[in-house]
Amino acid sequence: MTAIYKRELKSYLTSMVGYLFIFFILVLTGIYFSAYQLSAAYPKFEYTLSAITFAFLIGVPILTMRVLAEERKQKTDQLLLTAPVSVSGIVIGKYLALVTVFAVPMAVMCTYPLIMSRFGTVEFASAYTAVLGFFLLGCANIAIGVFMSALTENQVIAAVLTFVFLFAFYMMNGISSFFSQTSMSTCVTFGLLILAAAIIIYTMIKNILISAVIGVIGEVALIIIYVVKSSIFEGGIQKVLDVFNLSGHFDNFTSNIFDIKGIVYFLSVSFSFTSPLIPASLQNRLCCKEQAYCNHRKKIYNSFYIK
């Protein structure tokens, strides 16, 4: 894992991508810091951090678009998967390299409350709690970007997918207000989601029987739960969408609350979007080794019989 981490970190620090991301975050922070703290004389650095959360919509797609997509495009992923490195080490090493790049502007941000303290009273506990929350929010966004980069070998598509998903999460609080909170509408929505999941499973495995069975079981279970206790569905859509409201979980950190649930939430999001890459990479590793074995057998066959 250490070798992958050093290799990935070096690639970002020897190219413009890493420096562009660092510059972008620091410039936005400087602009809002000048507006809120220096000009308006607000003593809370949390206002600045809360205002620049949108920076992840632009910065994270740029930072993560090449992390796995470029490996697949250049076919260097096959070299990694056949190397004597664990699959988890590959994924974690790449992810930690991106987190390290993000930690550079975060280290600079830690100096802002110290600068503010020279001109007035600053609540350091509140300020650095917000800094911690902002860092965890960024780590969760980076994990989403790494996952999207693994879905395609085109960097532009990876960046667009990351932007779309992050924008949807960013607007999740507003999106939830468009849905009714009645149990009937929630049940119908979940039924459509189960149908969509069955269709997606069919497109992946091309087995209509298994897809139909999964869909029918899901729909029947949904109907039974609704008949037995329909009240459980009230406001269900809002509860589900709230799980994906990344910015909403960051609000507690900016309100002088050391939110343990928020810390667990951001760590869970980071784990949830990086852990699926491990079995997928493991399957690719097995395919690469099988292909290498077949090529070796073919060379042996040619050396003995072609002559």
Where do the language-model regions lie?
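Helix-loop-helix units of permease transmembrane domains in multi-pass membrane transporters
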Residues: 67-97
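Secretory targeting signals
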Residues: 29-36, 43-46, 50-55, 97-162, ...
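Alpha-helical transmembrane segments and their helix-entry boundary regions
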Residues: 18-19, 90, 157-159, 263
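Hydrophobic alpha-helical transmembrane segments
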Residues: 1-82, 105-111, 203-206, 214, ...
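Terminal transmembrane helical anchor/hairpin motif
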Residues: 39-42, 158-161, 165-280, 285-287
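Alpha-helical membrane-protein architecture signal
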Residues: 2-6, 88, 92, 96, ...
